[in-house]
Design a protein with these regions (language model features):
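N-terminal pre-domain/capping segments
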Residues: 1-142
């Protein structure tokens, strides 16, 4: 088993690769290209730049979570074919750059929904949380 840590990238994570490298036993990160729109092809150049950044910190990219899947694929609308082709190209590009593990989800519209991003636990730690009542109160038209 490999010990990894989720890393949101240098633009989006307050935890640096240098800090992750200091955690005993952690050898890699699970990451993604957060500034890439769903359905956009990940070029080999962008993938390689991400890998290089991680490797320069003494870690490696253990996997991707995730390549965002365009809602056209998830909902089955006609324009999905182009996005399926783009997704396949991205997976091929990841493989060519040595990344062989990709986590994915096919949840349409809301994707991974959380209603709270920092619920405080009794010990002072924070966790993600989901409350169905908050979702029920949403107005999708707004």
């Amino acid at each position: 088993m490999e010990m990894t840590l989720r890393w949101y990238g240098s633009k989006f994570d307050t935890v640096t690769l240098k800090q992750i490298r200091q955690i005993p036993g952690v050898t890699g990160v699970i990451t993604t290209l957060y500034d890439t729109a769903p359905g956009e092809i990940w070029s080999r150049e962008r993938i390689r730049a991400m890998i290089n950044e991680v490797e320069e910190a003494g870690l490696h990219v253990s996997g991707i979570e995730s390549v965002n899947i365009h809602d056209a694929i998830k909902t089955g609308v006609p324009e999905r074919e182009q996005y399926i082709d783009n997704y396949i190209t991205t997976l091929e590009n990841l493989g060519k750059e040595g990344i062989h593990m990709v986590c994915y989800n096919f949840m349409p519209v809301f994707d991974w929904t959380r209603t709270e991003l920092a619920r405080v636990r009794p010990d002072g730690s924070t966790v993600l949380a989901y409350t169905q009542e908050a979702i029920d109160a949403l107005d999708p038209e707004k």
